[in-house]
Each structure stands twice: as C-alpha cells, then as structure tokens.
Amino acid sequence: MTPKRWMLLTIAAACAALPAFGAANDTVTVTVTGELRQPVHFGIDAERLWFFWPERREQLAEMAVGRLKVDFARVAINGAYEREEGVTNISAYSDVIIPMMKTFRKYNPNLRFFASPRPMKEVYNSKTDAKWLADNFRNGNIGMAAYPLWVGGHKRVVKRVYKKVDKDKWARYLADYLNLMGREGLDVAYLDLMNEDQSMWGGDIENVLYVIDRIPTLLDRSVTMPKIVFPSTWSPGDGLKKFLNVPSVAARRGEVLKRIGVVATHNTPDANRNKFDEAGLVAFADAVRAVDPDKELWNTEMHGWVGTRSPSDDILNSIILWRHLAAGFSGIDTWLFFGPWKGAAHPMVYSNRGHGPEMTAKYEIFKSVVNDTCGGRYVASASSDKRIVPAVLMKERRMLVSALNTGDGEIAVRVRLPEGMHVSGRVERRLWEASKDDISPRISHLECGVQDWTSIVPARSLVHFALTVEK
C-alpha cells in the first residue's frame, strides 16, 4: 500500500466517526460526477443607472466589482449621445457612465465591459417630446427600440422612411461608440447588437452579418473589435422563434453561429420561481448546443432571481440561476444591480440616495458563487431527490457545491465526490436559512478532509460548501 493511499484511508476512517452537521431521518445524496462542462462567467448589470448616485460612486463601485470578483459589467450604449443624426451630446456619457466605468476599473483592473444599447424610450421626455413621438410613432410609443430613429429599423414608426434599417448608419453608430470609449481609455470586450426588440434586422440575417463585418473597418487603429453578442431576445422562446428558426438563419445555423461571439437571450417573462419557463430555457439551450456544443451561451439579462427585502424569496428564487447553469449557460448577467428602496424588486443592492446602500441575500449568495468560482467550470452533478437542487462549480482546485432545499422539511444532504478526488483541509459551510430572515449566511466548518460528508439543510434553505480538492 502506498503512503498516499494509507494516508487517505486513515483520514477517511477518522472522519467516518465524526458526527454529521446535525441529524435527520430524511437523507438525499448529491453525487458530484467530476465531469467538467461549460466555462462560467458572471457579471453585474449597470445598464440602467437610475439609482447610481455620483456622490456614492466609490462606495457603489466597490460593492459592485470590488467585493464581487465578477468577470464583466454590462454598461449602456446611450441613444441620447446622438439622438438626432450628426448632433452629439457628450454629457450622455461624461456625466455618469464614463466616470462609473473608470471607477469600476479602479476597483477591478481586469474587469471587462459588455456594452448594450439602452431602450430609446428613456431618451425622450413623454411630456416635452410628446408631439414628436406622436408624429413618428404609433400611439406616441417608441417601445423598446434600441437605436435612434435615423438608424432605421423601428417597427412602431409611422413614417415609411424610417422603417428599413440603414446598415451603414447602424455600423457607424456602434463604431462611433467604441471609438469614443477608446479615446477615454476604456476598451469594450463584448458588444450586444440587440436589446430584446428584434425589429432592427427585420429577420434578414444578412443585415446583421454586414454590420459585424463593417464595424472593424470603422474603428480607430487603437480600438479592438469586441466579441459580438446576439440576439438578446426577450425570452428563450423568442430566441427560437425570432432567431434560430427564422428562414434566413434556419438553413445556415452553423455558419451564422460561427460569426457571433456569444449567443444570448433574456428571460424577461420569468417574474419568479413560480413563473419560470424552464422547458423553454432548455429548448433554446439545446438548439444552440446541437449546432455548436462549445458556443458561448449567455443570459444577458437574467430575470426572476431578483434582490428583494425578503431573504427567503431570494433563497428560493435562486433556483433560476442553478437551472440556467444546468441547461448549459456559460454567462450570467444579473439584472439589475442598483435600485431603489421602494419600487420594482429588481436590484441586488438598494441604493436610495438618503439612506445609503443596502445589500440583499441575492448579493451575498451571488458573491459566494462568484468569488470562489467565476471563470471556472460547471461540474455535472445529480440529486437522488428533486427537492434538493444541486449545482457544482470548480475553478482550479477550488470547488463550490450548492444545495437548495425546496422542500417543507429539513433534509440531511450527503455530498459524494467522484472516485479519486478528496477534500484538502476543511469544508466551509455557508447556510442561508429562510426562517432566519438574514441576508448573510451562517458559517461553520467540517474540520476534516473526506470524500463525502453530510449536512442538515433546513426547509426552504440554501447551503454552499466551499472546499479545496485534490486528486
């Protein structure tokens, strides 16, 4: 018997006699297979800055990308910069967006920026611009159009001249943005062409491919072409209906996907765990993977798992994140990061001007995942009971095993590592217990390295096991 084998057997024998974290009659086994799947990248969403206060810029940036070791931050391409063709307004970027981006880089020099066109309805004032909107748009509603009217391609416009997209203007608009950021010393790693509304390209993929090819020819010499993100549809169902199954794409899916850096969708209709269309999510992911198993697949605006004033909701709604990872999504942009104390329950951090920021349980759960494994890989796992929803991520030797108890009673969760893998050092246990109404986890430790361990997970609660492994 080798010394290493003898040591492992000795450790296992010693630890077998240790008590589990509590005791329960109901035991569920989570088996970690060791099969490495897609790389995982996590980002925060700063596309909407309604509650990013300049006087709190340092504090909010540190919370967003300093404490959180995210890969990327989603930022806005602001239509207010050139609402009318040829008339630019630098304050659309210089007032808040550029200072925020530079402060982000201060706290995370390796942060990558993901630029996304912000809906144009935010550029117009419903009162002072009422006549202009009424003259140009049905019912005066610009909808979710992501580009200025002069670029064309808007489905709600009344005037025919704007109905067809001008591909060269579209490419120029995006290149101008990238060049402006470059002059400010800000490189953009990912560029989204859409933001839910797909009317710009009119179902003709040649429009999109033309723009992808045209942008690099318009960039300053010092500016690098970002990865293209497309189509960021309203829902995974739209990803099939309005992208993959569109006639101009359906017959040449492989060719089209090669030209796109990241295939993306939103899941806007999924308000919470009870309205989550998991089947639609899986169908879209499977369709992409069937064409290109290694294609980067992102949710560029993940809804449903939102920061609330109720930690128990944050805990249970986290199932939406775990299901995305299980479906094969490699990039998650959580929408939104900054928000108000009162109002839509989207934010990860509530940042009311007078009261200062307040973190949510979602923030703490996300931090637990991101800071241990962002940039790592998703690892296949299986649960012996559907009440326990597992997710396993690994970065180098660091592993995070997540187990969500969706049931109404406590469950003893036994985690089994694959053959030949064992724990080095202690297992850190982070528990978010719904009944405690606390955003922060209770932390305890398993003192001994073993190949499997058991822990009690209370009803409707979430546990993360953070550990270092050896093979």
Language model features: what each stretch is:
Residues 446-471:
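C-terminal beta-strand-rich structural cap/linker in extracellular carbohydrate-active enzymes
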